Regions:
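Predominantly extracellular/luminal regions of secreted and cell-surface proteins
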Residues: 22-44
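Alpha-helical structural elements
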Residues: 1, 12, 38-40, 44, ...
């Protein structure tokens, strides 16, 4: 009986350890870098963003960036799964008012363009709506 309990305990520990390894293998760096080539024509690359929801343990990933007035910004999303895999991108101005999102009426869009009309700090949040992988990458580009 002790052997059975011991083997069962070891199996549970091994399962928990392997689950943690799976979460750690998001590959957000590679996905963000792969996103660069998918930047829309006419936009100049600015920055990549890693989107690692740690297998669902993290509900939100947030970044900030200074945007300039009279500049258009393009933000795209990439991942290994289908389309955006439930990654919702929401952009907020310095007053935390929503100015743009890639999710509208139940549909996810792989990219969004934001025409900036006020220079300031903008917040870019990535959340997960029915995501399978909780992992992806994103690229920010601009044009004047």
């Amino acid at each position: 009986m002790r052997k059975v309990i011991y083997i069962l305990s070891l199996s549970i520990v091994a399962l928990m350890f392997s689950a943690n390894i799976i979460h750690a293998q998001c590959g957000a760096d590679a996905q963000a870098n792969a996103c660069i080539s998918k930047l829309q024509d006419g936009f100049t690359f600015l920055k990549t963003f890693k989107v690692d929801g740690q297998g669902g343990a993290k509900a939100k990933v947030e970044y900030s960036y200074v945007f300039s007035k009279d500049t258009q910004y393009y933000l795209n999303i990439c991942n290994d799964g289908a389309d955006t895999d439930g990654i919702v991108v929401t952009m907020y101005d310095s007053k935390r008012q929503v100015v743009s999102t890639n999710y509208n009426k139940g549909k996810f869009y792989a990219g969004m363009i934001y025409p900036c009309n006020a220079t300031g700090i903008y917040y870019i949040t990535f959340t997960f709506e029915g995501s399978q992988n909780y992992c992806g990458g994103s690229v920010l580009g601009f044009k004047r």
